[in-house]
Amino acid sequence: MALIYKTVAQTETGREGSVKTLDGFQTKLSFPKPDLSVQTENNPEQLFASAYASCFSQAVIVVMQQHQFSFSKKPVVSVKVELHQENGLFHIKAGVELTTNSNDQEVGKKLIQKAHEMCPFSRLIRNENFLGLTLNGIKL
């Protein structure tokens, strides 16, 4: 396996403070607000959801090119990330939804499944931590 990118993130403040990467990214952190109200700082779950969504979206673009799928509007990827607690341990769970403007469920199903196989974040989240794939509002 050939290394194509590497980054290092550092923090010493847990969820209350900031995190930075050695290549220049920096953001303030806070605990997630349970009431889903807007917060000025980010939390790790938001960062994970954002990274997963952008990675999965890129996989969708690649699969569309490989299989010559086309839609009149770009498909939209939504990633849901949940933080759970059980027996004193925290667990991250995540799921992916793809929204297309196509009525062809078979093409959409092939697209989301191939993108799921390709996306490195999807390969990280497996088994009981994966909430599943959803296509145009229908859970697969």
From Swiss-Prot:
Which processes are annotated in GO (biological process)? Answer: response to oxidative stress
Q: Which Gene3D superfamilies match?
A: 3.30.300.20
Concerning its family, UniProt says: Belongs to the OsmC/Ohr family.
Protein name in UniProt: Organic hydroperoxide resistance protein-like
- What taxonomic ancestry is recorded? Bacteria, Bacillati, Mycoplasmatota, Mycoplasmoidales, Mycoplasmoidaceae
